[in-house]
Amino acid sequence: MKKTIGIMTLVLATTMVTYAQSFKETFDANSLEWTECAYESNSGTAIIDGGKMTIISKGENKGLGIALTALSGVATKVGANTFFETHCYAPLDVQKPFKIRTHVNIQKLASDRTTGLVFNYKDGGNFYCFNFNNEMVRFERHVDGAVVGVIQQGVIWKDKKKVDQEWELISDGQVLTFIVDGIQILKVRYMPLEYTGFGYYTFGKQELAVDDVEFIQL
């Protein structure tokens, strides 16, 4: 009898693990095979270390450009704003309701420093993203390397200096909702999801540190 109960307990525990409704990535290891880029590329880096993931993109050095322009008398641009993303494949059925919750630290919000989420990621030219800076939030649909759809609205941050944030991406099967620190900042309808690719986006001289991300099947 005791043996039978033990077997039933083991089966029940196994079933509960198999059908777990959430998974939390704490970056103690690269368990979801994020696309790390540790070397200094033309666009930026994405490194997992010390229990967090840090994404850095490059930007124009405006101060040096102004100085060189003044010295030479010729308009001089130093560097360029770059887009950089890193992604994994989320343990979710994206055609069913889900929530993704993540805690991040942003270096700075500015008009030329953008950050956000990529999702429905098929490859480097085909994905959706929510991104924002200090004055606006955008939803973009990328197809074959081109932006083919944009929904944008202005946003007023209560505290532009607050760089520790909680982001949530929620899908109820019909509507996509992007939430920052408990406040809904953009809602998008009629954008079906097909792919489980999910990640983070930076543009310009931006640095984003990700503490954790939780995938929840609703």
Range-by-range predicted roles:
Residues M1-S22:
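Bacterial Sec-dependent N-terminal signal peptides
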Residues Y19-S43:
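Extracellular carbohydrate-recognition regions
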Residues F27, D211-F215:
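Extracellular beta-strand elements of beta-rich domains used
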Residues F27, I100-T102, K158-F178:
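Short tryptophan-centered beta-strand motifs in secreted/extracellular beta-sheet-rich domains
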Residues E60-V143:
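Secretory/extracellular carbohydrate-interaction modules
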Residues I179-Q184:
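Short strand-turn-strand beta-turns centered on an Asx-Gly dipeptide
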Residues V188-D211:
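Flexible glycan-contacting loops in extracellular carbohydrate-active proteins
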